[in-house]
Amino acid sequence: MLQALQKLLGDPNERKIRKYLPVVKLINSLEIEIASLSDAELRAKTTEFRQRLDRGESLDDLLPEAFAVVREAAKRVLNLRHYDVQLIGGMVLHEGQIAEMKTGEGKTLVATLPAYLNGLTGKGVHIVTVNGYLARRDSEWMGQVHRFLGLTVGLVQEGMSTDEKRRSYHCDITYCTNSELGFDYLRDNMATDIKEVMQRPFNYCIIDEVDSILIDEARTPLIISGQMARPSEKYLKAAQVARELIRDEHYEVDEKARNVILTDEGFEAAERLLGVSDLFDPKDPWAHFVFNAVKAKELFIRDVHYIVRNQEVVIVDEFTGRVLPGRRWSDGLHQAVEAKEGVPIQNESQTLATITYQNLFLLYPKLSGMTGTARTEEAEFSKTYNLEVTVIPTNRPIRRKDAPDLVYKTENAKWKAVAEEIAHMHAQGRPVLVGTTSVEKSERLSAMLKEMGIPHNLLNAKPENVEREAEIIAQAGRKGAVTIATNMAGRGTDIILGGNAEYMARLKLRERLMPKLVQLDPDNPLGSASTTSRGGGQGFGPASPKPKKSWTVVSPNFYPCELSARTSQALDEVVAAAVAKYGLNRLPELVVEDLIAVASEKAPVQDPLILQLREVYNSIKAEYEKVTEAEHEEVVRLGGLHVIGTERHESRRIDNQLRGRAGRQGDPGSSRFFLSLEDNLLKIFGGERVAKLMDMFRVDEDMPIEHPLLSSSLENAQRKVEVYYFDLRKQVFEYDEVMNNQRRAIYSERRRILEGENLKPKILDYMRKTVEEIVRAHVNPELPPEEWEIDKLTAKMQEFVPLLKENLKADDLRDLSYQEILDHLIKQAELAYEAKEAFLDTFEPGLMRKAERFFLLQQVDTLWREHLQQMEALREAVGLRGYGQRDPLIEYKNEGYELFLEMMDNIRRNTVYNLFVFTPQLVQVPQVAQAVPAQAVAASPETGGVVEADFAED
């Protein structure tokens, strides 16, 4: 029915694409005219466009000509010309949509079109990538187009100074990572001086791999935290208790919700083992520790969710299979896993500032993104982010054949069939990529292939395999290659049929340069300081130390040919030149990695050594390409890359990403998934239906099962998971929306304080409100005056404003009305404030203004931190109210709002009180000191030294 309707009305995506075709035609018609311009005339177009914007033309008016200018600039600078489909992609991005573009279709080049057009406004364009390497590569490579046309291009990287970042954020186009962008946003909202603020107001953002950031990472909060000590012995005892407790007797595991529930017997057993009467005793709480210990035991599996390296628990990204050094699970969970593994337990942290990617990117007035797979998540992009998905046609037709799934009764039978399929393809000479879902499963298959004598490469989160990522990917498309990869989806690298000559040339440079340039570890003179490789696997931390470090590729016959005598000599000469310039074994490993990366990219450079390195790199690449291109043709004839999936992922999108590794840029290829009724997806989400199917199919284990009921069960299971996780993300979004509204309010107020020249009117308003509160607490106008608490009121006012101790008497207020008392006390407080200001002016003119800003920021930051903890506790508490027929979200909104109002009142009261009670302390300092946030600094006229006015309270 749906297909018939689509046929009648036409595919909505096709209709969308058709509306862009007249604009593509117009851009193409301008090509000859724009090509005739000189470089200077082409560059002058930028000034012309900006003037036209000033005169009232819109970006849409400029689009055809601006796109034609970018296309011409890319031809001249990069020797790349935008295809028509790439122009459509650029228009989709400019309109604030998501462009789905298949692997190898040139997403990076597409982004130059809307980035240039929107960069003309001068309000800033952010191009966001998933790692620092890609951000730098794109800023240097694609940035050439923008620089050629006269736009400024910035790059934000981890470890840059505040000034460097500010300069980059103030460029027309800024390349950065999603995490650095988010952390800088939070840092800006913790700044104590407007000079520390790095970012401008957000304008337009293009996200590369948008599904990875807005869907997969949506529930991951960015957190800036401070250390908070927590007793490690509690984690260790809780881990011992968890080991004693028995599943299904003492606790139940909800794998779908990734949670554990203790039974009554479980509570009794835990209390008995710990020697306590109540796990929830507020004076000695144990419940949180025990729950986390049981979660660590049942739900967090070594070599699946984390690995242990150098006595540390390191998280493995479930989507990409990469390790995430530096990331920690929150809420004591990481400590529970550390206790389980018997490694040192690190301190918990207190949240100082936090935001989710969902709310960070919703701060942009215009947002767009690119990815190879977004259609399956179209509903979520639309509902959560108000983003439309448009599928961009490929430049060449897709030739990949996707075979139907083969489903086996048992897991053993499935793995046996996978191994046989690999052997069959390997015998034909076709390269094979096998996707697995965990380190453990990849090693199981590897062991089977070893027994069968099939050579293969293993790519998973284990340090020894991480090191070889570039080497493995470089040859994954070669004839007869077999590659087993854990969660290949997020690896962000193309598999090129016949082998990747660029990677191979880079590895040859690395093999020769690293042993000569990298500094030696004094404790390990045979090896380097670190065993980390970044040659294609950014984002990995240091691996376990090895007795000797070698950068030589492991695979025999890795390089497609021996280098010619001329190129070998040029390589020897450039290595000698590098040693002459930098010294023998003097550079950190990452510096040498960067040197090789810059030499092998296309970005413009001035350094003679890098230019020499680049020349040698290009010679090596050219020699390798002669062989790899011939092999490419042979592999194409054999049928291209064959992709094998060994389990359905929870998301169809991730399955599609794995399939998409085959058939890039019009190459042939094929894919097939091998599944079993014992796979996690079917076990957890297929439920009883699958159990019945298992009884129904009384067939031999080695026979694949094909049945409409089974296919629908699979699809239903996957859809259930997608809906389940969408609901989870939606729930996170709804709860975080409450926090987001509060965050926006407090950050806006904070920015006004930071930017405000004169905060005195705000402080006087705070003071009047606080005096009114004090009066209302002690004087009720509806009661007779003899019942008013005048003595208590006087004492409270004297406590609040110490300067009134001498002048304010209770007897002065007894015969006054409520309004007269209020007016009199406000007047007295104002006079006291003026007196305090005059007193401070004797130390330094304008010192009161500095004090106002200091105390306001101090109170906002301190009370916001406490508020974050209260909101976290509230969120945990309201979860239980669902059992009482009350909506937890509404309860969270209402009580969260009350907590927020209370925090704002406390900011007001505390700031005014601190301003009245603080006393400057004079400290003679022999020379100009560094500014300290808690101090105001003024020159001493007598000595020319510095007087520090410390904002100390009495």
Swiss-Prot record:
Q: Which Gene3D superfamilies match?
A: Helical scaffold and wing domains of SecA, P-loop containing nucleotide triphosphate hydrolases, SecA, preprotein cross-linking domain
Q: Which GO terms describe its cellular component?
A: cell envelope Sec protein transport complex; cytosol; plasma membrane-derived thylakoid membrane
The residues the record assigns to binding ATP are Q86, G104, E105, G106, K107, T108, D494
Superkingdom to which the source organism belongs: Bacteria
Membrane topology term reads: Peripheral membrane protein
Q: What coarse category fits the chief subcellular location reported for this protein?
A: membrane
* Annotated catalysed reactions: ATP + H2O + cellular proteinSide 1 = ADP + phosphate + cellular proteinSide 2
Q: Where's it found, cell-wise?
A: Cell inner membrane; Cellular thylakoid membrane; Cytoplasm
Q: Could you say which EC number(s) this protein's record lists? A: 7.4.2.8
One GO molecular-function entry: protein-exporting ATPase activity
Alphabetized UniProt keyword annotations = ATP-binding, Cell inner membrane, Cell membrane, Cytoplasm, Membrane, Nucleotide-binding, Protein transport, Thylakoid, Translocase, Translocation, Transport
Give GO BP annotations, semicolon-separated.
intracellular protein transmembrane transport; protein import; protein targeting; protein transport by the Sec complex
Mitochondrion: present as a keyword of the record?
no
Xref: Pfam families:
P-loop_SecA, SecA_DEAD, SecA_PP_bind, SecA_SW
Keyword Nucleotide-binding present in the record's keywords: the answer is: yes
Give the protein family.
Answer: Belongs to the SecA family.
Q: How does it assemble?
A: Monomer and homodimer. Part of the essential Sec protein translocation apparatus which comprises SecA, SecYEG and auxiliary proteins SecDF. Other proteins may also be involved.
Q: What does this protein do?
A: Part of the Sec protein translocase complex. Interacts with the SecYEG preprotein conducting channel. Has a central role in coupling the hydrolysis of ATP to the transfer of proteins into and across the cell membrane, serving as an ATP-driven molecular motor driving the stepwise translocation of polypeptide chains across the membrane. Probably participates in protein translocation into and across both the cytoplasmic and thylakoid membranes in cyanobacterial cells.
Please give the name of this protein: Protein translocase subunit SecA
Q: Which organism is it from?
A: Synechococcus sp. (strain JA-3-3Ab)
Gene name, per UniProt, is: secA
